[in-house]
Amino acid sequence: MIRIALLGCGEHSRISHATPLARYAALNPGVIELVAACDLELTRAQEFCNQFGFARAYSDAESMLSKEQVDGCVCVMPMNSIVSMAIMLLERKIPCAFEKPLGISSAEAEKLGLVARETQTAHMVSVNRRFMPFLTEAKSWATAIGPIQYIRATQVRHGRNERDFIWSTAIHALDALRHIGGEIISFDADVYRQAELSTLWYGVSIRFENGTRGRLEVMPTAGMVEESYELLGEGFRAQVLAGSGPQRSLRCWQNGELKLEKTSSETEAEDLRNGAYEEVVEFVRALKTGTPPRPSVEDILPSARICFAISESATRQVEASA
């Protein structure tokens, strides 16, 4: 069996990593073994063992990795520890999956990219929008009809006034646009900083290499939680309500008619709706076949570069208007 360990047992790890790992183990007997869970708070790791079936609990990563034979490691760290822990795993040649963002600065992201290229260790970045079932279906449906001419992503949140939002969270939506539209050749970021707003809002116009145009709208303090994607072309439109919102839906129109409509049930497990389970499927597939999982740091680095550039531009705009 493939032996998988988990580093980090916080709430996000519970929902987006431990839950789908346990689901995969239950649905595919004899394929993976959840050998260990590790957290600085040992009681958390022990709780993961009891709830999700990890065999042993640790409070120290070094101890876990020296005692366990690990075929793959899922690493879920606070933002300021993502790069150091990811580099440790890459340099140990341990196939791994780790969370976005790729560090807390552009320099950290570039350092992680360099180590990934130098070590050539199999790894995967967790950006679940690339695996979200409704968004995947929308992309396939629209692409089958004709070239996508315009893509829009809108990320709405409530009370998210942290200054790092554009590169720590909005990277999800920006990366989803790249996943659908391809490489971005230029972008123009407009920063909204009104007296009534507690933080920055963003509007980003995008040009893709293939000629497609796009738009990213980020409103972190708009009073509710929703994330939407629209894929448009001559005679068709696909709309996905996704992300962390309460309603998940897919609607596709062609030539004035609604051709496809799906809505997920609130009783459906979150990891099946948000792409987390499909991420596990991809990681295990790669471990089974000995092939690199996707997406890699190299795949996500362009998204990180753009988000950090938008953040730096926003800082300059705010300083200039002060």
Regions found by a protein language model. Give the residues of each.
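Beta-loop-alpha module in the N-terminal Rossmann-like domain of NAD(P)-dependent dehydrogenases
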Residues: 41, 52-114
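Contiguous beta-strand/loop segments that form the cofactor/metal-binding neighborhood of enzyme cores
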Residues: 168-247, 277-291
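C-terminal helix-rich "cap/oligomerization" subdomain common to oxidoreductases
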Residues: 6, 72-77, 283-322
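Mid-domain beta-loop-alpha active-site segment that forms a flexible
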Residues: 126-133, 155-187, 200, 299-300
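C-terminal glycine/acidic-rich active-site capping loop/insertion
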Residues: 128, 230-298, 319-322
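N-terminal Rossmann-like dinucleotide-binding module
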Residues: 1-52
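A contiguous active-site-proximal alpha/beta segment in oxidoreductase catalytic domains
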Residues: 103-160
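Hydrophobic residues in well-ordered beta-strands that form the structural core
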Residues: 98, 123-125, 240
